[in-house]
Swiss-Prot record:
Changing residue 89 to A: 2-fold decrease in activity. The keyword Repeat does not apply. Belongs to the purine/pyrimidine phosphoribosyltransferase family. It is found in: Cytoplasm; Nucleus. Pathway: Purine metabolism; AMP biosynthesis via salvage pathway; AMP from adenine: step 1/1. GO terms for molecular function: adenine binding; adenine phosphoribosyltransferase activity; AMP binding; metal ion binding. GO terms for biological process: adenine salvage; AMP salvage; purine ribonucleoside salvage. This is Adenine phosphoribosyltransferase 1. Catalyzes a salvage reaction resulting in the formation of AMP, that is energically less costly than de novo synthesis. It comes from the Eukaryota. It comes from Saccharomyces cerevisiae (strain ATCC 204508 / S288c). It catalyses: AMP + diphosphate = 5-phospho-alpha-D-ribose 1-diphosphate + adenine.
Length: 187
């Protein structure tokens, strides 16, 4: 199967909720994909195929998943690729010494952490999450990968809200599996 055919089938499983969590947003819930093992496998296969095509000569060493929805498919993708999985968590959730990065949210700021010994310097890393909106949390994860002195190859997202221009904040190429939302909902 091609990436486009995987995406077409996966898109049919999404549930849409207009004006959630705020006015102008069409929330596309991708959780129904995980209720169907066949669709979940196709989600993983689509990302794996993309990464094999995008980086045929490069060994990927780690998948870094953002709390919390990056945890839903990041470990399974890492397993399918035969690489390690490393979580980026909210402050205070990881033991030991951690690097920290702040990001802005709608109502203030938040802090992400990654363990200092999680990834050896020079490792090749892919960051995954469910959606890119404003790009703040993904940019913070990218900053953490830089603090580890690893090579951030790409950000991978299931979906994207294009009109929020989040990818402009990111320091590496972006791949979005499912069709992006080009504009906000009309009021």
């Amino acid at each position: 199967m091609s990436i486009a055919s995987y995406a077409q089938e996966l898109k049919l499983a999404l549930h849409q909720y207009p004006n959630f969590p705020s006015e102008g947003i069409l929330f596309e819930d991708f959780l129904p994909i995980f209720r169907n093992p066949g669709l979940f496998q196709k989600l993983i296969d689509a990302f794996k195929l993309h990464l094999e095509e995008a980086f045929p000569e490069v060994k990927i060493d780690y998948i870094v998943g953002l709390e919390s929805r990056g945890f839903l498919f990041g470990p399974t993708l890492a397993l399918a690729l035969g690489v390690g999985f490393v979580p980026v968590r909210k402050a205070g959730k990881l033991p030991g010494e951690c690097f920290k990065a702040t990001y802005e949210k709608e109502y203030g700021s938040d802090l992400f952490e990654i363990q200092k010994n999680a990834i050896p310097a020079g490792s090749n890393v892919i960051i995954v999450d469910d959606i890119i909106a404003t790009g703040g949390s993904a940019a913070a994860a990218g900053e953490l990968v830089e603090q580890l002195e690893a090579n951030l190859l790409e950000y991978n997202f299931v979906m994207e809200l294009d009109f929020l221009k989040g990818r402009s904040k990111l320091n590496a190429p972006v791949f979005t599996l499912l069709n992006a939302q080009k504009e906000a909902l009309k009021k």
